[in-house]
Structure formats: C-alpha cells, structure tokens
C-alpha cells in the first residue's frame, strides 16, 4: 500500500445500494488500496428525506440529478445509481462525469399496494398511478415491468420523492400503488401489503475527471473484496437496511428481510450491447437524446474495457 493516501468522496445512497461502500470502509479495504474514502450523505438528499414532495405527473418537470447533483458541485466524485438514470444524468452533466463501471449491487424494486387494495396482478394497474421517483430506478423499472401487460399509454406514473414518502403515501391511501426497493418491500410484506410485480436491475457507477485510472482500479479492488465479504455472510450488515425504516411505520427486524433479494456481484465493465438495449428503451420513451451514444457517455478506459469484455464473452 502507498504511504500517501489518496482522498476521494463517494456518495452514500440507500443502504441496499451502498452496502459495498459501507463494508469496504468498515473493513479497511479502501485504506488497504491506498485510498482514504469519505462517504458523503448529500445535502439535497437530507432535504428530500425531511420534506415530502408534492406529486408531479410529468417527468420533464423534474431535473435528472435529484440528490445526486452534488457531483456537479464538487460535493463528491463518485456515485452509483440505476442504469437508466445514470445514462440520463451523464448526458446532462456539466462536470465531465462519465460512466466507469457497473454497480456491485443488483437491486430489486417491487410495485406494492395495500392489503385491502382491489389490485392483484399487473394488468390491474392499467391507468392507475404508480408513485415513483422520476429519473431513478423506481421510475424506469415501473415502465419496464408494466410494459408487457398493457399499452404504453396505460402505464401511469407520478413523482413522489424518496422511498419512505412513496411508502407512506400508499400506507395513508393518498396513492394506490408505489415502486420501492428493500428494505421497504419487506416492510410492506410485514404490514400485509401485496406485491404486484417485482424485477431486478443493474446500476452504474459514474465519476468526475478526478478519478484517474489508478484510483478507479483501487476502488474496484476494494469493492470486489467487500462483495466477497457480503456474500460470505450478509447478516452482520443487515442493520444498515432495517435502520432506514422508522419504528412508527413498522418495527422491521433483520430477520424480516428476504435474503435472496439482496444480490451483490463483483463490479463488471459496462458493454456496448448492454448500453444499446437500455438506450433503445429510453429513446423510444423520450427519456434520453438519440445523440447520447455509448462513446459519449461511458468513460474512455471503462469504454475500452467494456468493449474488450464483450469481445471475450462472444
């Protein structure tokens, strides 16, 4: 390890997404790689958690960065989020941010309704508003999950901020359905809510130009060790997830979490083929500019490694 530590800041997201960062820091894996990592809870996210958003029905009325806007202001240099949203935000960046790799967390989101809801299958949600966070995983996964069951114009979404706000809106009867990730899916099941449909999806890591090749490789090695630690036994780390659910909603125990929902892989390079599938989906729905190609959104070194990986797999 180098005697001189390189410092960088990584955004702290929902625990289910950021668990490899949390583990790598707690176990000293970043330090082992010569990197002093500061995990940053963005100021914008603090504000969003504290105050509920008014429902908004047009995705164009919401700026794509959400609480991730801190990377544009120098608040942090690396963050990860859903694949679709990262493509959109990388298109919109003014800070030279690029995709560098796939996220270690392979997350799931579910559309939930209350236990007394008349809805039971995806088809029942035709023309029913589903609460999502526009330009985030809940938004895109809802479009994808419902697309096979109804016409595109029958999929109705409405923006209601962060997951605790969407959950509470369903709980209070202000909205009929919402898309949420863990630990909120388990909280819903504990309260007798119904899961209408559920799907896994990839995320991407992006970084500003301060993340050079050496730092990129060091972070990736630390994340690989963290994933191995998590997959060896995730149970000591589950309290990070359950802590996100306030006790006045439900007292969620670590034993309430369904462990097969929690998937973590070694970070993989993002291939042109994967990009193209998501690009086509987004262009068809007017969610990204047709000019936002792989070469424009994916960082140079990551792009080359992604192409090599695709060639080796073919």
What are these regions (language model features)?
Residues 213-289:
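Secondary-structure end/capping motifs
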Residues 2-143, 148-150, 176:
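Short, glycine-/small- and polar/acidic-enriched structural segments
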Residues 283-314:
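Conserved C-terminal helix/tail region of periplasmic/extracytoplasmic solute-binding proteins
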Residues 152-156:
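Juxtamembrane helix-loop boundary signature in multi-pass membrane transporters
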């Amino acid at each position: 390890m180098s005697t001189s530590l390189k410092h960088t800041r990584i955004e702290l997201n929902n625990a289910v997404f950021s668990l490899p960062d949390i583990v790598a820091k707690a176990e000293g894996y970043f330090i082992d790689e010569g990197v002093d990592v500061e995990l940053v809870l963005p100021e914008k996210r603090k504000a969003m958690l504290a105050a509920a958003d008014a429902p908004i029905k047009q995705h164009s009325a919401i700026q794509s960065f959400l609480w991730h806007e801190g990377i544009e202001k120098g608040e942090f240099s690396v963050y990860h989020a859903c694949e679709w949203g990262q493509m959109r935000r990388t298109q919109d960046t003014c800070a030279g941010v690029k995709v560098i790799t796939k996220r270690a967390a392979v997350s799931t989101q579910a559309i939930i309704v209350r236990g007394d809801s008349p809805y039971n299958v995806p088809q029942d949600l035709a023309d029913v508003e589903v609460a999502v966070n526009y330009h985030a995983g809940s938004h895109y996964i809802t479009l994808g999950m419902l697309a096979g069951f109804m016409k595109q114009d029958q999929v109705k979404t409405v923006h209601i901020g962060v997951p605790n706000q969407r959950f509470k809106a369903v709980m209070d009867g202000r909205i009929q359905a919402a898309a949420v990730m863990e630990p909120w899916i388990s909280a819903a099941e504990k309260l007798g809510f119904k899961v209408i449909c559920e799907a896994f999806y990839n995320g991407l890591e992006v970084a500003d130009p301060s993340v050079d090749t050496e730092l990129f490789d060091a972070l990736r090695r630390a994340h690989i060790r963290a994933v191995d630690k998590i997959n060896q036994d995730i149970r000591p780390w589950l309290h990070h997830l359950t802590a996100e659910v306030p006790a006045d909603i439900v007292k969620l125990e670590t034993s309430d979490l369904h462990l097969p929902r929690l998937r973590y892989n070694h970070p993989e390079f993002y291939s042109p083929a994967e990009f193209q599938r998501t690009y086509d989906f987004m262009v068809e729905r007017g969610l990204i500019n047709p000019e936002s190609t792989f070469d424009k959104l994916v960082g140079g070194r990551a792009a080359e490694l992604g192409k090599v990986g695709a060639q080796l797999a073919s």
